[in-house]
């Protein structure tokens, strides 16, 4: 919407919903943070920081995370959307 400012998303309810979705997917895959990081070719701190809400996950990272979790990115995204305040407002 023109003229409307986007609020900061880090540590917002919607960001928390994304983190919860990704943590749940990692748990369902039976992976530790280190195992997921190894699959991504990243340090364990990369996973820890987004799971602790210290950093955002961009779209490209979301797709890479989905692949590393052997999860369908569309299914994960839908799970995220159905749990967010922003999506519920637009329905």
Task: Please place each PLM-identified region on the residue numbering.
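A short, Lys/Arg-rich alpha-helix, primarily the initiator
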Residues: 2-28
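Short, charged recognition helix plus adjacent turn
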Residues: 2-4, 67, 75-91
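Short basic helix-loop element that most often maps to the first helix and adjoining turn
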Residues: 20-39, 64
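Key DNA-contact positions within bacterial/archaeal DNA-binding proteins
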Residues: 34, 45, 55, 74
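Helix-turn-helix
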Residues: 40-41, 46
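Short, basic-rich loop-to-helix N-cap that marks the start of a DNA-contacting helix
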Residues: 54-64
């Amino acid at each position: 919407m023109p003229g409307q400012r986007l609020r900061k998303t880090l540590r917002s309810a919607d960001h928390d919903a994304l983190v919860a979705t990704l943590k749940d997917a990692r748990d369902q895959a039976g992976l530790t943070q280190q195992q997921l990081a190894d699959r991504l070719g990243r340090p364990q701190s990369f996973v820890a920081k987004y799971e602790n809400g210290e950093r955002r996950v961009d779209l490209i990272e979301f797709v890479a995370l989905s692949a590393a979790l052997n999860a369908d990115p569309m299914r994960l995204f839908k799970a995220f959307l159905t749990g967010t305040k922003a999506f519920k407002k637009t329905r």
